[in-house]
Curated annotation (Swiss-Prot):
Cofactor(s) demanded: Mg(2+)
Subcellular location: Cytoplasm
This protein's UniProt keywords: Cytoplasm, Glycosyltransferase, Magnesium, Metal-binding, Nucleotide-binding, Purine salvage, Transferase
Gene: hpt
Homology family: Belongs to the purine/pyrimidine phosphoribosyltransferase family.
Protein name per the record: Hypoxanthine-guanine phosphoribosyltransferase
Cellular compartments per GO CC: cytosol
GO biological process: GMP salvage; guanine salvage; hypoxanthine metabolic process; IMP salvage; purine ribonucleoside salvage
Main subcellular location of this protein, as a coarse class: cytoplasm
EC number(s) reported in the record: 2.4.2.8
CDD domains given in the database record: PRTases_typeI
Residues bound to GMP: 131, 152-153, 159
Known catalytic reactions: IMP + diphosphate = hypoxanthine + 5-phospho-alpha-D-ribose 1-diphosphate; GMP + diphosphate = guanine + 5-phospho-alpha-D-ribose 1-diphosphate
Length: 181
């Protein structure tokens, strides 16, 4: 069982769902009548995006990007790479980027600049988790679920080497799991 690799549970499934509902209400007010393009960052944001968008009670569209600065590492490489771009033209659209976690901030800073370059009407960020201690660029989310300490967290979409995404909570991975690789 994969739970044996988890040092402790930081945020329960119930806490995540309650926060998704709370953020959904705020986003409903923010985007009423704006038909936002909600952009999920693959693969990690998928569980949060699914729960969050079910709580947003206004017209919206969904699209996805696969953008990475990690690979299989535990520390950002610093180089942002688009693996899959949007299928939707963002010009004149209100963009809401949905992210699982903001750590270094490089990926989101890159995306905000990219969407502005592509002439989006507005660009805002909602993240399930924020790790301010990991930040290397000056970027802040407009909506944050939870602040987390500078520990290696997995679950609810967040992974280590493509595993642990299916855990229904946010947990701290035992250091011996990633230090042995």
């Amino acid at each position: 069982m994969i739970e044996k690799d988890i040092e402790k549970v930081l945020i329960s499934k119930e806490e995540i769902l309650a926060k998704s509902a709370e953020l959904g209400k705020q986003l409903t007010e923010e985007y009423q009548g704006k038909n936002p393009l909600v952009v999920g960052i693959l693969k990690g944001a998928v569980p949060f995006m699914a729960d969050l968008t079910r709580e947003i009670n206004t017209y919206l569209e969904l699209d996805f990007m696969d953008v990475s600065s990690y690979g299989n590492a535990t520390v950002s490489s610093g180089e942002v790479k688009i693996v899959k771009d949007l299928d939707t033209n963002v010009e004149g659209r209100h963009i809401l980027i949905v992210e699982d976690i903001i750590d270094s901030g490089r990926t989101l800073a890159y995306l905000v600049d990219l969407f502005r370059y592509r002439k989006a009407a507005s660009v805002k960020i909602v993240t399930l988790l924020d790790k301010p201690e990991g930040r290397v660029v000056d970027i802040k989310a407009d909506y944050v679920g939870f602040d987390v300490p500078n520990e290696f967290v997995v679950g609810y979409g967040l992974d280590y080497a493509e595993t642990y995404r299916n855990l229904p909570y946010i947990g701290v991975l035992k250091p011996e799991v990633y230090e042995s690789n």
